[in-house]
């Protein structure tokens, strides 16, 4: 099968990240004979100014026919783009790896964990009300269906990794909603992996104390949103973190960092998070096709990034180097 990928270059540094990464993606396609068709589309602040919509109809038409979305950072319209696409295509699993890179200053040089976050429910469902002057209410939604779905995703990740899952919740206080999530975790995970439960406040503390104790963390939407940013920063920098939004019908891959308008056009942006998102996309292609060439390409790209950091010769300013975006891309290309 040929994977059709809708590419949203985005705003700020987004277009130059994609432009700089094109030769690496082309090299992977050529070297591993990958069946990938990349289609550039417009979305974000630029699209809003041009068409009056952050996600114009012609963009949605292309995305509808695509298998995956590769997205650069967008600016003020991020919610209009990211949240809308997540909802439209039921991208229920947010996957956030947090992994240390060589020569990146961090208290912990050996962090390697994945946070699997439920992406459709919880307080982020958006059910908020003003009941009277000075009084507001939000509804926290937890269903057995969504809980089982995300816990099974976490199980699959754990079986490919170190076979440990930490279920993070606050069932001692949220006894009904988090209680349901915790019971689903026990039902699915006990006996299949090294399983533990942890209250979210303890998890936040333990990530700071010793992040190496974690392998796969599975949790609900709000807790996952907070913990994943914490974990990325502990591993080195939020600016180096990739992410995936996985759905059965369509998935989206994007760097966690923002559009960084202050450095846009200067050629000094770090391509790491964008390229690691490409690696995650290739891994998803392997999951769907079962063709080894996609996972080989994914690992090749990740290893080239790691080797670039090991050498330390061509790193951008944000990670202590003096290289330009093009220099770092050339170095990654060399290690491929």
Curated annotation (Swiss-Prot):
Keyword annotations from UniProtKB, A to Z: Amino-acid biosynthesis, Branched-chain amino acid biosynthesis, Cytoplasm, Leucine biosynthesis, Magnesium, Manganese, Metal-binding, NAD, Oxidoreductase
Cofactor note: Binds 1 Mg(2+) or Mn(2+) ion per subunit.
GO biological process: isocitrate metabolic process; L-leucine biosynthetic process
Enzyme class label: oxidoreductase
Name of the gene this protein is made from: leuB
Cofactor(s), by name: Mg(2+); Mn(2+)
Organism: Saccharolobus solfataricus (strain ATCC 35092 / DSM 1617 / JCM 11322 / P2)
Stored NCBIfam families: LEU3_arch (TIGR02088)
GO cellular component: cytoplasm
Residues that hold substrate according to the record: 86, 96, 117, 201
Designated name of the protein: 3-isopropylmalate dehydrogenase
Homology family: Belongs to the isocitrate and isopropylmalate dehydrogenases family.
Site (Important for catalysis): 124, 170
InterPro entries per the UniProt record, alphabetical: IsoCit/isopropylmalate_DH_CS, IsoPropMal-DH-like_dom, LEU3_arc
């Amino acid at each position: 099968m040929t994977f059709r990928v809708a590419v949203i270059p985005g705003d700020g540094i987004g277009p130059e990240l994609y432009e700089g990464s094109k030769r690496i993606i082309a090299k992977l396609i050529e070297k591993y004979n990958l069946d990938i068709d990349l289609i550039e589309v417009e979305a974000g602040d630029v699209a809003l100014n041009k068409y009056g919509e952050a996600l114009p109809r012609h963009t949605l038409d292309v995305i509808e026919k695509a298998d995956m979305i590769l997205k650069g950072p967008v600016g003020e319209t991020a919610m209009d783009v990211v949240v809308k696409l997540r909802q439209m295509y039921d991208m229920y699993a947010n996957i956030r790896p947090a992994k240390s890179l060589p020569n990146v200053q961090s208290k912990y040089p050996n962090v390697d964990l994945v946070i699997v976050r439920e992406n459709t429910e919880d307080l982020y469902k958006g059910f908020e009300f003003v009941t009277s002057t000075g009084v507001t209410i939000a509804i926290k939604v937890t269903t057995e269906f969504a809980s089982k779905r995300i816990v099974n995703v976490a199980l699959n990740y754990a079986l490919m990794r170190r076979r440990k899952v930490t279920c993070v919740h606050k069932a001692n206080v949220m006894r009904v909603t988090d209680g349901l999530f915790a019971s689903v975790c026990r039902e699915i995970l006990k006996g299949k992996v090294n399983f533990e439960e942890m209250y979210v406040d303890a998890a936040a503390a333990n990530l700071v104390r010793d992040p190496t104790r974690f392998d796969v963390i599975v949790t609900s939407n709000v807790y996952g949103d907070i913990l994943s940013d914490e974990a990325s920063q502990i591993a080195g920098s939020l600016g180096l973190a990739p992410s995936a939004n996985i759905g059965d019908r369509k998935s989206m891959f994007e760097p966690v960092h923002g559009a960084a308008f202050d450095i846009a056009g200067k050629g000094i942006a770090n391509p790491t998070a964008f390229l690691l998102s490409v690696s995650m996309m290739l891994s998803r292609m392997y999951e769907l096709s079962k063709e080894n060439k996609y996972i080989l390409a994914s690992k090749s790209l990740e290893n080239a990034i790691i080797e670039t950091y090991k050498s330390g010769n061509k790193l951008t300013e944000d990670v202590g180097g003096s290289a330009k975006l093009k220099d770092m891309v050339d170095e990654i290309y060399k290690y491929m």
